[in-house]
Amino acid sequence: MKGEDGAKMMRILCLHGFRTSGSFLRKQISKWDPSIFAHFDMDFPDGIFPAGGKSEIEGIFPPPYFEWFQFNKDFTEYTNLEECIAYLCEYITSKGPFDGLLGFSQGATLSALLLGYQAQGKILKEHPPLKLFVSISGLKFREPSICEVAYKDPIRVKSVHFIGDKDWLKLPSEELATAFVNPLVIRHPQGHTVPRLDEEAVCKLSNWAMEIILSQRSTNAAPVDTVDETVTNKEEEAEPKEECECEIAAAAAGAGNGIALQRREAEAVEAVNA
């Protein structure tokens, strides 16, 4: 697919949260400034399994609802995870190629796993390396055999991590960010939700996205330049600015824990009512 400027759009696979749906995640993301992902083609599939229990968004957003896999109360044992991974690898291969992943909660957790596995040569060996990742309230898997592979080395993918001050997954989300080389962390005052973005957050995310787009175009669809390992983190609060200057966007225009996870994943309803 091509954008309005005739350039080929980069593709992002977007994975929804537990017992919601692709259409619900699309609605959540729709409250963001549309210019942020104007140069991306975004795909919102439904989870592989129908919801195995009550969805907390019942009465807020219409069914059906889905989940990607199941887990125990401590988020240390997983059911149907391998089947889910196989399904997504087939989806990415048959409907791709994709340039990156975006996910909320269970979807973000799963996306990070796919990125780590691909980096280690475990999956998607014939698919071009995924280049970018948008994580909203994601966390690491806790099963040692998974961690030893997926997070063995820092993941060299351009990543941005949204972390809520009131999110019950705040600390696990911070831990996930450390699994990536030079992550951009954007904090917000909300809870476990796809947050509404203030002007500064919009600017930071827009610049992050446009850096990737411009790098992709300048290398004629080659992989995005490797990230600089000498920089450990790009916390947005590291250097306060009086105003946010979206220089790159302007130039382009010119050119927790598992116990709570199952019970509270559906706080995503905040995304509708916020």
Language model features with spans:
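A conserved short beta-strand
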Residues: 124-140
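Serine-hydrolase catalytic machinery in alpha/beta-hydrolase-like enzymes
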Residues: 9-97
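Gly/Ala-rich beta-loop-alpha elbow adjacent to hydrolase catalytic centers
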Residues: 102-112
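Catalytic histidine-centered segment of alpha/beta-hydrolase-like enzymes
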Residues: 191-203
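Short beta-strand/loop motif that positions the catalytic acidic residue
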Residues: 155, 159-163
